[in-house]
Amino acid sequence: MHVLSVSSLKGGVGKTTVALGLASAAFSRGLRTLVIDLDTQCDATTGLGAIGEFSETTADVLQAPRHNIVHRAIVASSWGKNQSGTIDVMVGSPRSQAHDNPYPTINEVWRLEIALTKVERDYDLVIIDTPPSINGLTRTAWVASDRVLIVAEPSLFSVVATDRTIHAVEELRKGLTPRLGVLGILINRLKPFAPENEFRVNEMREKYGSLVLPTVLEERSALQQATGSARAIHSWPGQTSQEIAAQFDEVLDSALESFANQETRRPTRAERKAQRVTRIMRGQTLDQVLAFEAEPGDDPEEQSPAEALGL
């Protein structure tokens, strides 16, 4: 089982739409897919057609990641009603905001990772839709992830947010979860022939090099229509929707290639403990641990994004 977080530290870049597009690509390929909705707006839950009252949600899982709670928080998406395969969602909740502490403890950020050990054999791919912030929910998602896909739009503020995201991922990788890495930067909502957009795309390619994925998603109404109708883009009619679906297939291929040589099993409880430095104490915050473990000269703010990731 592989885990991919879809993230951006800037809101409004189409992060949830990208997460759903990737889920559509994985589902259409026959992968057993789980989407975890950690964004308190719960748009991924709605987009997957999971509407109603639920006994358990992500908020409950993050409070107590026990086997029965984890399984009750996962429901089937309406996407799979007329197709074979698995596409499920761990239901989002506004109550998850209680777990979005800007200074989460080590115990708190490990809870989603613990929860995923309860469904290790049930899924091939887990996609996490994260909030547009670097607080507890996003860090919890990253600790449980193998890769982070950074979604960016071609704008100045998005470029700045992308830089912050890269450095934050690298800080967490060095301090707590060595398997974590950036899959790449996906440029979304490109407006063709818009000079400012073209300038920012070129700027990102010059700044981040190979981190910028070759696939660029243009702003198209078909994608918004499919998402708004709680339908998978791969099942939405029309030539344009099939072109969009093919682009998400390309991004999924990049993810699967990145996962190819990686261990798929989640670490056991003993292994998780072994990964932690011995000086981490119960109740210590993640920021305290990362600051304590930093070595002189390792400040990611002094490195380029490519250098920070060892590229």
Model regions and ranges:
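P-loop NTP-binding core
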Residues: M1-L311
